[in-house]
């Protein structure tokens, strides 16, 4: 983006990385959009909506898909077939993008929607399967492992505002799967993640988040009040 618009680099050159962070963030976003990053990210996001159609009717979906997505969708369809990935179904439910809710320690909760709960490679117990169209999750595996672990340990599912919560199905809690299909590459790879490690990291992150909410407990206040810095006041 900065290569297309040299003025962005010129504007950034005199700025201080610490003191001028907001201005630098704005220039970085402008460079991202100028480089086509926003369009690419949007097209990658649209792949999630095509995924459900692909699991129902691969050939029909490919015939209706936009030209710039056909190669990627064909690769995803081939990966689904090669690994015998079948969307899990229960009476009246097809477990694609369910909204699931997971209890966490310290009376916390997490919720979200995996792309699908599916049987993978013939395993009778379904697993979490999520599509990623950006960078290789193996470059920074902790975040997706936490995300998929939270989905895998979900206890409830919620389908619509006028419907009550229902129990989430039994799922594999040891592993989850990423369909890694970087947009525009025409490739798709199934990546297995260790969700037992992801779940431990989710607990750790929860405790850290709770601890940071109540910073006052880390102070031992004297009888006479002390003058706090502006930063300390913000944290309290």
Go through each PLM region and give its residues.
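Glycine- and charge-rich intrinsically disordered segments
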Residues: 217-236
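Intrinsic disorder/low-complexity segments enriched in polar/small residues
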Residues: 12, 122, 233-235
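Metal-dependent nuclease catalytic cores that hydrolyze phosphodiester bonds in DNA/RNA
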Residues: 1-111
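Short linear sequence elements within intrinsically disordered, low-complexity coil regions
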Residues: 53, 156, 212, 223-226
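Short, charged low-complexity intrinsically disordered segments located at boundaries
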Residues: 78-85, 185-194, 231-236
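Acidic-enriched, low-complexity/disordered segments with a strong bias for Aspartate over Glutamate
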Residues: 16, 20, 25, 57-59, ...
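Mg2+/Mn2+-dependent nuclease catalytic core
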Residues: 91, 98-218
């Amino acid at each position: 983006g900065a290569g297309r618009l040299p003025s962005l680099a010129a504007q950034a050159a005199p700025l201080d990385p610490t003191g001028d962070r907001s201005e630098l963030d704005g220039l970085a976003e402008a460079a991202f959009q100028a480089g086509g990053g926003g369009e690419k990210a949007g097209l990658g996001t649209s792949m999630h909506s095509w995924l459900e159609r692909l699991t129902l009717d691969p050939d029909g979906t490919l015939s209706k898909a936009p030209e710039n997505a056909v190669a990627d969708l064909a690769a995803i369809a081939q990966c689904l077939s090669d690994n015998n990935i079948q969307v899990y179904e229960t009476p009246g439910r097809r477990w694609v993008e369910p909204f699931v809710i997971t209890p966490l320690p310290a009376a916390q909760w997490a919720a979200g929607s995996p792309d699908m709960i599916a049987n993978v490679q013939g395993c009778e117990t379904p697993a979490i399967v999520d599509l990623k169209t950006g960078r290789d999750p193996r470059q920074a595996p902790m975040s997706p492992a936490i995300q998929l672990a939270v989905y895998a340990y979900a206890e409830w599912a919620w389908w619509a505002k006028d419907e009550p919560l229902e129990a989430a199905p039994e799922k594999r809690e040891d592993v989850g799967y990423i369909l890694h299909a970087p947009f525009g590459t025409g490739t798709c790879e199934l990546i297995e993640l260790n969700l037992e490690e992801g779940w431990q990291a989710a607990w750790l992150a929860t405790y850290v988040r709770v601890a940071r909410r109540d910073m006052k407990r880390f102070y031992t206040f004297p009888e006479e009040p002390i003058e706090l810095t502006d930063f300390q006041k913000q944290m309290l």
